[in-house]
Curated annotation (Swiss-Prot):
InterPro entries on file: Alkaline_phosphatase_core_sf, BPG-indep_PGM_N, Metalloenzyme, PGAM_B_sf, Pgm_bpd_ind
Pathway of action: Carbohydrate degradation; glycolysis; pyruvate from D-glyceraldehyde 3-phosphate: step 3/5
Ligand binding (Mn(2+) 2): 13, 63, 445-446
Binding site for substrate: 124, 154-155, 186, 192, 262-265, 337
Main enzyme class: isomerase
GO terms of biological process kind: glucose catabolic process; glycolytic process
Catalytic activity: (2R)-2-phosphoglycerate = (2R)-3-phosphoglycerate
Binding site for Mn(2+) 1: 404, 408, 464
GO CC annotation, single: cytosol
Alphabetized GO MF terms: manganese ion binding; phosphoglycerate mutase activity
Keyword annotations: Glycolysis, Isomerase, Manganese, Metal-binding
Cofactor entry: Mn(2+)
Protein name listed in UniProt: 2,3-bisphosphoglycerate-independent phosphoglycerate mutase
Organism, scientific name: Cellvibrio japonicus (strain Ueda107) (Pseudomonas fluorescens subsp. cellulosa)
């Protein structure tokens, strides 16, 4: 069998485009490979945020949405948008899974525990959804309603949780029932890399009421964390309990409703709470028999718990479609973005298609990635170059995590190093592509590293941007890329390069016109 000449899609996570040079790590970095590509190869800018990717207008994109949209080849109305609509039209308040969980607690005089990232970020959750759930639980008659608030500071400014916690306190005060029971930073509660020591911290504060710190109110607890030098993301577990109140923990027979809608960072804490065969850490004697645990969306196919908003069918995604045509494909990324090039790219589907290989390169075990901005890019590149030169694959999808993961630190110098590490990787990968006469498309799922400081807040800009991202065609063939595209147009463009017809389910458009 003759060697295949692959089409390689390189997703440079968090690598946005900005004309503004100030606080722009892409501009500050030494990027000879990228600079040459931008000068000599067909290129354009594409949208990754708002309505272009099925999000509310003006809402920044994120890795889940970006990879889902790329793989689907169409605009996919995201969970955020679906839940917003259900709240506005009232369906949220009659959602059968939420109703069952709340009514069970009421009937059995048990508590309703609401978990989630309390944030305006809109990436993993939105605080308005948590406030709506508090209202729903109390208005249905629940007498014990507790919010376990995970704090953001990553998809929001580093110290922005006070307004969110104050509003939660105000909502409870107005309803006359319930309170915030604990706070903890997302660094602990929403890990996705099997760092179970972190997850245990969040588990313990909710289940055993054990934590290093306590406070009378959530805002007091946050202020104490700031005094200790902790930003929202890193706030240590704090029990919130007034002078005349008992510590509110998750107990046998209680209902737990997890309001995060993005799956990847919700899985570990969910497994710790409900998995009978859990081995991540010793849960001790106190592990509760939760009567009802509700996932707002499906966190994983093997998590057996009711789902309030089940996944919508995304048939004929890129991976499924080319597998059906007998083509071979590879997905490759380091741990932090592996789910994105597999689960999310396949439309929220865990299946591995015929002819689909996967390579997972472990992310480095460091506390934060600014300590190692190159992350595992060299190792990913080693494996990717080998795969390109193997002649086995028709299509290869690769994610480089650096610019997003280091961009979230808000540390400019580290972000510059991340950009430079990706540029070195690009040079090696494109040399391999050229060697086998393959083709490459280079893009990003959203911006981040091109906007590292927020002059409005006076704080580092740790969240994603709403700026466009590059889309570059690298080939021995000549061509032109159309303007005005979005991530929904990436898969149709790859199919055109592979000389494959576009399935009717893909409503994105091919952006490339080949010459000659």
């Amino acid at each position: 069998m003759s060697a295949k000449k692959p089409v390689v899609l390189l997703i440079l996570d968090g690598y946005g485009y900005s004309e503004r040079t100030k606080y722009n790590a892409v501009y500050a970095a030494q990027t000879p490979v990228y600079d040459n590509l931008w000068k000599t190869c067909p290129n354009t800018l594409i949208d990754t945020s708002g309505m272009a990717v099925g999000l509310p207008a003006g809402q920044m994109g994120n890795s889940e949405v970006g990879h889902t949209t790329i793989g689907a080849g169409r605009v996919v109305y995201q969970s955020f948008t679906r839940i917003n609509k259900s709240i506005s039209d009232g369906d949220f308040f009659t959602n059968p899974e939420y109703v069952k969980a709340i009514d069970s607690a009421i009937a059995n005089d048990r508590a309703v525990h609401i978990l989630g990232l309390l944030s305006e970020g809109g990436v993993h959750s939105h605080q308005d959804h948590l406030y709506a759930m508090i209202n729903m639980a109390v208005e249905r008659g629940a007498k014990q309603v507790y919010l376990h608030a995970f704090l953001d500071g990553r998809d929001t400014p580093p110290r922005s949780a006070e307004a969110s916690l104050q509003k939660a306190q105000d909502v409870f005060a107005k309803l006359g029932t319930g309170r915030v029971a604990s706070i903890v930073g997302r660094y602990f509660a929403l890990d996705r890399d099997n760092r179970w020591d972190r997850v245990k911290t969040a588990y313990d504060v909710m289940v055993t009421g054990e934590a290093e710190f306590d406070a009378l109110t959530a805002v007091d607890g946050l202020k104490a964390a700031y005094e200790r030098g902790e930003n929202d993301e890193f706030v240590k577990a704090t029990v919130i309990c007034g002078e005349d109140e008992e510590v509110a923990t998750i107990n046998d027979g209680d209902s737990v409703i997890f309001m995060n809608f993005r799956p990847d960072r919700a899985r570990e804490i969910t497994r710790a709470l409900i998995d009978e065969n859990f081995t991540g850490f010793d849960r001790g004697e106190t592990h509760p028999a939760i009567a009802h645990f509700v996932q707002t969306t499906e966190y994983a196919s093997d998590i057996k718990a009711p789902i309030a908003f089940p996944p919508e069918d995304l048939s004929n995604s890129f991976g499924e479609y080319i597998a059906g045509l007998g083509k071979t494909q590879l997905r490759i990324a380091e741990t932090e973005k592996y789910a994105h090039v597999t689960f999310f790219f396949n439309g929220g589907n865990e299946v591995v298609y015929p002819g689909e290989d996967r390579i997972l390169v472990p992310s480095p075990k460091v506390a934060t990635y600014d300590l190692q901005p190159e992350m595992s890019a060299p190792e990913v590149t080693d494996k990717l170059v080998e795969a390109i030169e193997s002649g086995k694959y028709d299509a290869i999808i690769c994610n480089y995590a650096n610019c997003d993961m280091v961009g979230h630190s808000g540390l400019f110098d580290a972000a510059v190093k991340a950009v430079e590490a990706v540029d070195v990787a690009l040079g090696r990968v494109l040399a391999a592509v050229k060697k086998v006469d393959g083709e490459a498309l280079i893009t990003a799922d959203h911006g981040n590293v091109e906007e590292m400081f927020d002059e409005e807040t006076g704080q580092p800009h740790t969240q994603h941007s709403t700026l466009p991202v590059p889309f570059i065609f690298v080939s021995s063939r000549k061509g032109k890329l159309a303007s005005g595209g979005s991530l929904a147009d990436v898969a149709p463009t790859i199919l055109a390069l592979m000389d494959l017809p576009q399935p009717k389910e893909m409503t994105g458009r091919n952006l490339i016109t080949l010459e000659g």
